[in-house]
From Swiss-Prot:
It is found in: Cytoplasm. Belongs to the GPI family. This is Probable glucose-6-phosphate isomerase. HAMAP family: G6P_isomerase. GO terms for molecular function: carbohydrate derivative binding; glucose-6-phosphate isomerase activity; monosaccharide binding. It catalyses: alpha-D-glucose 6-phosphate = beta-D-fructose 6-phosphate. Pathway: Carbohydrate biosynthesis; gluconeogenesis; Carbohydrate degradation; glycolysis; D-glyceraldehyde 3-phosphate and glycerone phosphate from D-glucose: step 2/4. Pfam families: PGI. PANTHER family: GLUCOSE-6-PHOSPHATE ISOMERASE. CDD domains: SIS_PGI_1, SIS_PGI_2.
Length: 430
């Protein structure tokens, strides 16, 4: 990817060229820490070794028995589902199989999906490192029962991605299900380029080897300077802006295929960096749609955010027909991609004119290699930010607290966090 930082120098808040050059000394130290973590395959840092350690042949072999499915169900939550959804939404087409993500426990949504797909032609990928995730296991039980009631042998339609032990691993062994391992030391939000994200991508027909090639190319280009490494440029600059008051980061791709990428980024950024009353709140937006709504706030609201605009340099062609309608002749003969790029440039200029810090990110195209590199580089950017901020990037204690409280509310008396629910103050208005 290419990162353009030029507009942050005169922004409010902003970063000077000298400031970035001074920060680059700390980036070099962060790079050394990251490289040491990679060499030792330390927890968290192990995610950056996935281009070398993931076995795409094993993944292809595991999914080979599922011939021509009509639908795929991803049953997971958070990083156990969002990475796969990002890959499918960016690179998948509208042909079968259709992919459905069951990453919530809304009964209306789950019921609607199960009633709309042919379960006998559906592949179920259940993803949970621990094998005990309440939402994932609940949805799995619901899908399994639906298949059984429909006369479908669910064991013929299920592939499991899980840890080396736990309920799901035991189930896979007892039912002889195909099962792939979640790599050790790789947090869920960093697992898109592992079995966690690649199983469904392979089922969908995406060239997962090309994704890994792109990520490997990005890994090979890491160096100890933000002026030579786009990932460090992004991570260091967003960190510097956050320390100066830009506590919100708006991720705004100008490509609908990257809309779920913005959602993936939001989890990565929030869960990794939101520690010790610090962090940068990620917001998902989509160009050009949200420039007709959210842009009002971004341009004219408080100067407490950085806007990340991202686009591919190459797009498919779709010509706008000529028209004799009054005032629209300028559109005729142009291209939808050209219009979207004009919207991108106009939005960037609008923000710069209002002194809003804006970072431009460009990739060659939305293809497997470019996407693999993009995902890898944003993971590196996040880790770089965490190193500079001295936060434990790879933990998620607040998330774990909520999980324990939910289990306590459902009757598991081992989790006392549920008591806080009853103790909270209320003021009801009806």
């Amino acid at each position: 990817m290419q990162v353009d930082l030029g507009t942050v120098f005169d922004a409010t808040p902003g970063v000077t060229q000298d400031g970035l050059e001074r920060l680059d000394e700390r980036v070099a130290t962060a790079h050394e820490r990251i490289e040491r973590g990679r060499r030792n395959n330390e927890p968290g840092y192990a995610a950056l070794n996935l281009p070398e350690t993931v076995d795409t042949t094993t993944i292809h072999d595991a999914v080979a028995s599922f011939e021509d499915p009509t639908a795929i169900l991803i049953v997971g939550i958070g990083g156990s589902a969002l990475g796969a959804a990002t890959l499918v939404d960016a690179l998948g087409d509208d042909t079968a199989p259709s992919v459905y993500v069951l990453d919530n426990v809304d009964p209306a949504s789950i019921s609607r999906i199960l009633e709309s797909i042919p379960l006998s032609e559906t592949v179920l990928n259940v993803v949970s490192r621990s094998g005990t995730t309440a939402e994932t296991l609940s949805n799995f039980l619901v899908v399994r029962e639906a298949m059984t009631k429909a006369g479908v042998d669910w064991t013929d339609r299920t592939i499991v991605t899980t840890g080396t032990d736990g309920n799901l691993r035991q189930l896979a062994k007892s039912e002889s299900l195909p099962a792939l391992s979640v790599p050790e030391g790789v947090p869920g939000r960093f697992s898109v380029l592992s079995t966690v994200g690649l199983v469904v991508a392979a089922l969908k027909g995406i060239q997962i080897s090309e994704l890994i090639t792109g990520a490997a190319d990005a890994a090979a280009e890491l160096s100890g300077s933000l002026f030579e490494t786009p990932a460090y440029a992004y991570g260091a600059t967003t960190y510097a802006l956050a320390t100066r008051g830009a506590r919100t980061n708006v991720m705004m791709p100008y490509a609908e295929n990257l809309e779920t990428f913005a959602e993936w980024f939001a989890q990565l950024w929030a869960e990794s960096l939101g520690k010790d009353n610090r962090g940068q709140t990620p917001i998902r937006a989509l160009g050009a749609t949200d420039q007709h709504s959210q842009l009002q706030l971004y341009r004219a609201g408080p100067h407490n955010k950085v806007i990340t605009l991202i686009r591919p340099r190459n797009r498919p062609s779709c010509t706008i027909p000529s028209t004799d309608l009054d005032g629209l002749s300028y559109l005729g003969g142009s291209d939808l991609g050209s219009l979207l790029d004009a919207e991108f440039e106009a939005t960037e200029a609008s923000l710069v004119d209002a002194d809003i810090p804006t970072i431009r990110v460009e990739i060659n195209a939305i293809d497997a290699q470019s996407l693999g590199a993009l995902l890898y580089e944003f993971e590196v950017a996040c880790i770089c930010y965490g190193e500079l901020a001295s936060v434990p990037t790879f933990t998620q204690p607040a998330v774990e607290w909520g999980k324990r409280a939910a289990r306590g509310l459902l009757g598991d008396d081992k989790f006392m966090e549920a008591a806080a629910v009853a103790d909270k103050p209320t003021l009801r208005v009806e």
